[in-house]
């Protein structure tokens, strides 16, 4: 069922990987041995009740893990339960359509999503945070995110060709139309390759994952963003820095072609941006703690001040 749906709806790699994880870790361990025709709504309701008390990460890759007392306290969210419901709803609806079942056992009412208010920074906190970031990769990633409300993958997916310093009467713009992700190689074998623009070479032999560059989610995700004067200057300096780093050792420089690169030319992955941000937060407890994605929500406030 999963590969067929993936092909039919042209799922992105992350979508396939996420749905596969839901099936392996939250559905099969609990109702996987039951006959489909014997499932009733109360079985599904019982599953939701069990999952609501289940610790995050209890199963990984379909295998049960031993968790510490601290890990056992963090249970699955209502949003995750809602995702399980949607997956079951769609799969059993198809079973009815295919004539395998007469009626779907999935209850009409879905578990309620968990809504959490995201923390954002105030204007002065954003200014002070940028001033305190000495890591040039992190500084540029955060600056781009605050100006353009970018996701981590979109920041990592930018290339020098996306930057136009002459656009908008010299104000400058940058275009967002790609996203970088690391996905399981098994996933790549199942998904539509049409959305994948590039698969990066493996850093380690025998790696089970691949770093890819893909189209952004929707046409609305493709956008052109005006630069601020400060970002324009930082981008100019950054591109000069890339040229200098390549000139130091051109034979060993591994030019990934991405905007954000390590000194050796390799692409900066989204997870590295996240780790750098966490490291900075640990070193600066005076700032309200937010996840990197929270910077995207702080972007609207930042844009009002420029």
Per-region residue spans from a language model:
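Short, Lys/Arg-enriched alpha-helical recognition elements, typified by the DNA-recognition helix
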Residues: 1-96, 256-259, 274, 278
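Conserved tyrosine-mediated DNA breakage-rejoining catalytic core shared by Y-recombinases
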Residues: 110, 125, 158-244, 251-254
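Arg/Lys-rich amphipathic alpha helix in sigma70-family domain 2
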Residues: 93-102, 237-240
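Residue-level detector of conserved, well-ordered beta-strand and adjacent loop positions
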Residues: 45, 109, 118, 122, ...
């Amino acid at each position: 069922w999963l590969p067929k749906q993936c092909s039919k709806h042209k799922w992105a790699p992350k979508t396939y990987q996420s749905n596969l994880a839901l099936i392996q870790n939250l559905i099969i361990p609990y109702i996987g041995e039951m006959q489909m025709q014997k499932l009733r709504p109360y079985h599904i309701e019982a599953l939701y009740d069990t999952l609501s008390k289940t610790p995050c990460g209890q199963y990984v890759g379909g295998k049960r893990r031993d968790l510490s007392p601290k890990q056992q306290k963090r249970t699955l969210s209502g949003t995750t339960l809602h995702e399980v419901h949607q997956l079951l709803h769609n799969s059993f609806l198809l079973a009815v359509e295919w004539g395998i079942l007469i009626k779907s056992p999935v209850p009409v009412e879905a578990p309620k999503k968990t809504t959490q208010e995201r923390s954002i920074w105030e204007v002065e906190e954003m200014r002070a945070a940028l001033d305190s970031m000495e890591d040039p990769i992190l500084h540029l990633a955060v600056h781009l995110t605050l100006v353009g409300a970018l996701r981590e993958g979109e920041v990592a997916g930018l290339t020098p060709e996306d930057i136009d310093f002459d656009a908008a009467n010299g104000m400058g713009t940058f275009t967002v139309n790609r996203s970088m992700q690391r996905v399981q190689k098994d996933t790549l074998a199942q998904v539509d390759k049409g959305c994948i623009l590039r698969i990066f070479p493996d850093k380690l032999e025998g790696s089970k994952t691949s770093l890819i560059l893909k189209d952004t989610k929707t046409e609305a995700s493709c956008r052109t963003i005006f630069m601020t004067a400060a970002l324009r200057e930082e981008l100019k300096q950054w591109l000069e820095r890339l040229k200098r780093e390549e000139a130091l050792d051109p034979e060993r420089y591994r030019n990934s072609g991405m905007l954000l690169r390590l000194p050796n030319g390799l692409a900066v992955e989204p997870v590295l941006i996240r780790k750098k941000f966490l490291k900075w937060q640990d070193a600066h407890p005076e700032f309200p703690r937010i996840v990197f994605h929270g910077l995207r929500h702080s972007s609207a406030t930042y844009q009002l001040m420029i």
